[in-house]
């Protein structure tokens, strides 16, 4: 198989098989898998993702489409920098070496990529365009810098966006996140929150789960902002945001965020308060708040109820109010809010019911003075009107989504093209001086950004006044590069950021394939970037991905030795029902079956498996054992079965090729119908990404043809036709062996250039059908009827069948129950 695979990979390369033109009379189809980070090796999870995309690309090509199927590299990022620190090397050397190796791996798998469009995000020829675009956004006031409380990863020594903090820990390092105030660059994604939210409903070909995740992340809330006066400090107010102002008479406290400004202004920071604030600082996301136990501490302050000056509400510093949502303050109504209720129970605060049914949602107002008897919606309007009349509140819309923090305090990223001058302030780098590139001669002798200590790079003259100034030493968040790369594939050699004409032809991406873990960050940022690029005339679209498919993960068992160290599967051998270390024969503990990951070493080396089996066998296995959207458990027996199937195809070719045509033989209608049914269903299955079902159907056809070969009297013409069809249907899945067999079958045209097999609708129509014949509900016979027979004729024929007459014993049936084309039940 390896010789066959190398042969066809060479042919495809020489024939430029998968290069596509931007000029074509064919309809276009743009299929794209999320580009990989060049970490060193392609893993099986990648292979599954890329195999799914490759099936679609090859199938759509055979369907007559001009298919764009590119590949590139998301090449900036922390792993390269960490490797440089560890190995005393340069990040670019590590990155480019990995790209070279991983590209060879992808090519060895036979993926149909147009490599002429390859992009590399760490190439200055790529990132110079995003630097210019950043400056264009700055000119539109869509970029700003401010000091803000950020998520600081103490291991990676950089800031993380909220989306990059998982359960209070850094998404890569796993370190507990700290809160720090730093100057950061932001993009105003919140200016586009409403459009990003509204357009979700038009993403019909996206998984519902992803749409819901984006809706929840944007998190639109409609309510009111209003002010409470602080007791004894009546010139000072606390502004709260509420979506349920009608419950104001049930308020028993004010909850504020741990970093609310009033804490610095008026609150005496006792040791208990300081400790509580420190504890709260580890909670960075509302998803973590939902899981956390609700806690609070009395601040020492009270506020005055806006509608009753005799009611004073305690101000509680809480762990479930965030400063970056709403105003950083809420009023707590424990009777009608779960979180407020939990805190009230813990702190012994009053719980006053103000909705008659006690519902958290809606009902009739009680215990609410002038709101009594109103419905919740009526009361809400009346309260808001009162706030507005008193001048203490106004209607407001809030979003959970916050502006995108794009600054990272690391070296291996795209430099932010700004200069800091003591005289002129912040000055953009002139367009003519782009790209701002990274220096080659950096030292990684510490765990901090080496740009801070590189004097010849850091110190420059101000473009405005020519005085000494300092470059911005932060680099872009790597999601910046991956937010627009799909537009660059349309013409990766474009002089400008994009080739507008090429983008008009190819975009939007028809099918985007990747993991659901990117549902919020990457996909949201890419949607945002597309809207920005549209407004700058780089693209004509405002949504980048027409269709989205999220594949499941590849799983494998985990293993640990007696010292609790992770082991690779290749280091473990099974003896009976137990596991042992191959080298020292010590006992090994098998852990959970989990997503393949380097950290837990439960990964399969692609090169080892490919050498042992074949690229086609791997492709077939990752597509056949589970629906593509579900997780797939790696199985040695599974890939062995796929390898045997490929060998079976080769053996079938030898057997079929030697058969002599017999023009007098009767056409095998059943086999011919199965062939055409398989063509129809496989095409439908590929279109709906039911790839495992398509493979199952082709296995059924394979077995049917194999069975026919073994008969004494056979229809050679239909067998040969069916085998030709089978090879063609299998080609998008296992392209190497099918190209080889196709050629040996005497076909002149390359299989990748052929038109996908078409079915004949008339052959699918049955001329007869078989019915089960029952007497008193028990099967007594079967009978084959013509499709155009009437129900009365069916009843007449079945009653007179000898096996039925035996049970009738000369009597007339009491009733005949007919289920058309399935069952006739004669009641005696």
UniProtKB/Swiss-Prot annotation:
Its EC number is 6.1.1.4. It comes from the Bacteria. Signal peptide: none annotated. It catalyses: tRNA(Leu) + L-leucine + ATP = L-leucyl-tRNA(Leu) + AMP + diphosphate. A motif ('HIGH' region) lies at residues 36-46. It is an enzyme of class 6 (ligase). CDD domains: Anticodon_Ia_Leu_BEm (cd07958), LeuRS_core (cd00812). ATP binds at residue 598. GO terms for molecular function: aminoacyl-tRNA deacylase activity; ATP binding; leucine-tRNA ligase activity. Keywords: Aminoacyl-tRNA synthetase, ATP-binding, Cytoplasm, Ligase, Nucleotide-binding, Protein biosynthesis. Belongs to the class-I aminoacyl-tRNA synthetase family. PANTHER family: LEUCINE--TRNA LIGASE, MITOCHONDRIAL, LEUCYL-TRNA SYNTHETASE. This is Leucine--tRNA ligase. It comes from Rickettsia prowazekii (strain Madrid E).
């Amino acid at each position: 198989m390896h010789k066959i695979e190398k042969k066809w990979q060479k042919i495809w390369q020489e024939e430029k098989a998968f290069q596509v033109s931007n000029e074509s009379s064919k309809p276009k189809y743009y299929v794209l898998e999320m580009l990989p980070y060049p970490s060193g090796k392609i893993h099986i999870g990648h292979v599954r993702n890329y195999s799914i995309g490759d099936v679609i690309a090859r199938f759509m090509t055979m369907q007559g489409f001009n298919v764009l199927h590119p590949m590139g590299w998301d090449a900036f990022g922390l792993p390269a920098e960490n490797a440089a620190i560890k190995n005393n090397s340069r990040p670019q050397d590590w990155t480019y070496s990995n790209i070279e190796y991983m590209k060879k791996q992808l090519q060895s798998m036979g993926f149909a990529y147009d490599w002429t469009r390859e992009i590399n995000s760490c190439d200055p020829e790529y990132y110079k365009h995003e630097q210019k675009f950043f400056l264009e956004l700055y000119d539109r006031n869509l970029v700003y810098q401010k000091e803000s409380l950020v998520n600081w990863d103490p291991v990676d020594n950089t800031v993380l966006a909220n989306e990059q903090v998982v359960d209070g820990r850094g998404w890569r390092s796993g370190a507990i996140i700290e809160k720090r105030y730093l100057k950061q660059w932001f993009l105003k994604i919140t200016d586009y929150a409403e459009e990003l939210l509204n357009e979700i409903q038009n993403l019909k070909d996206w998984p519902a789960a992803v749409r819901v995740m984006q809706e929840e992340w944007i998190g639109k809330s409609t309510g009111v902002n209003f002010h409470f006066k602080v007791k004894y400090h009546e010139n000072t107010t606390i502004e709260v945001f509420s979506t349920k102002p009608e419950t104001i008479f049930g308020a028993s406290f004010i909850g504020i965020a741990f970093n609310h400004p009033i804490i610095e202004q008026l609150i005496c920071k006792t040791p208990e308060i300081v400790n509580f604030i420190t504890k709260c600082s580890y909670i960075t996301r509302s998803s973590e708040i939902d899981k956390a136990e609700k806690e609070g501490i009395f601040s020492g302050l009270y506020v005055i109820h806006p509608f009753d000056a005799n009611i004073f509400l305690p101000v509680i510093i809480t762990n479930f109010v965030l400063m970056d949502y709403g105003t950083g303050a809420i009023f707590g109504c424990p009777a009608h809010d779960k979180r407020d209720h939990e805190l009230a129970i813990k702190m012994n605060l009053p719980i006053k019911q103000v909705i008659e049914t006690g519902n958290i949602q809606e009902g009739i107002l009680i215990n609410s003075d002038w709101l009594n008897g109103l419905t919740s919606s009526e009361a809400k309007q009346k309260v808001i009107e009162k706030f507005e009349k008193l001048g203490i509140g106004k209607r407001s819309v809030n979003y959970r989504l916050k502006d995108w923090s794009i600054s990272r305090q690391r070296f291996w990223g795209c430099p932010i093209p700004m200069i800091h001058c003591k005289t002129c302030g912040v000055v953009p780098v002139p367009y003519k001086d782009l790209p701002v590139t990274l220096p080659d001669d950096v030292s990684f002798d510490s765990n901090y950004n080496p740009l801070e200590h590189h004097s010849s790079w850091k110190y420059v003259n101000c473009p405005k006044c020519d005085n000494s100034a300092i470059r911005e030493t932060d680099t872009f968040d790597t999601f910046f590069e991956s937010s627009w790369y799909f537009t660059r594939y349309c013409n990766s050699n474009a002089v400008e950021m994009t080739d507008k004409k090429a983008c008009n032809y190819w975009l939007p991406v028809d099918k985007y394939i990747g993991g659901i873990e990117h549902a919020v960050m990457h996909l949201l940022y890419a949607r945002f970037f597309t809207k920005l690029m549209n407004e700058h005339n780089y693209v004509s679209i405002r949504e980048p991905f027409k269709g989205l498919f999220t594949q499941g993960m590849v799983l494998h068992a985990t293993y640990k030795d007696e010292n609790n160290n992770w082991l690779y599967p290749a280091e473990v051998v099974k003896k009976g029902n137990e596991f042992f270390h191959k080298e020292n024969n010590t006992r090994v503990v098998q852990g959970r079956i989990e997503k393949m990951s380097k950290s837990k070493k439960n990964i399969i080396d692609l090169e080892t498996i490919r050498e042992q089996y074949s690229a086609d066998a791997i492709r077939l296995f990752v597509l056949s054992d589970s629906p593509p959207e579900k997780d797939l458990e790696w199985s040695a027996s599974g890939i062995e079965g796929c390898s045997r199937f490929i060998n079976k195809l080769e053996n079938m070719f030898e057997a079929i090729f030697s058969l002599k045509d017999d023009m007098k033989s009767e056409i095998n209608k059943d086999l011919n119908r199965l062939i055409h049914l398989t063509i129809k269903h496989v095409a439908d299955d590929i279109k709906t990404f039911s790839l495992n079902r398509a493979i199952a159907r082709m296995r059924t056809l394979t077995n049917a043809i194999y069975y026919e070969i073994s008969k004494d009297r056979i229809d050679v013409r239909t067998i040969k036709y069916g085998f030709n069809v089978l090879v063609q249907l299998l080609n998008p899945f296992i392209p190497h062996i099918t190209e080889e067999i196709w050629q040996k079958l005497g076909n002149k045209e390359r299989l990748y250039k052929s038109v996908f097999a078409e079915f004949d609708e008339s052959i699918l129509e049955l001329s007869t059908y078989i019915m089960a014949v029952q007497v008193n509900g028990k099967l007594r016979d079967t009978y084959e009827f013509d499709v155009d027979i009437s129900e009365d004729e069916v009843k007449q024929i079945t009653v007179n069948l000898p096996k039925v007459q035996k049970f009738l014993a000369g009597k007339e049936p009491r009733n005949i129950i007919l289920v058309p084309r399935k069952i006739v039940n004669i009641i005696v």
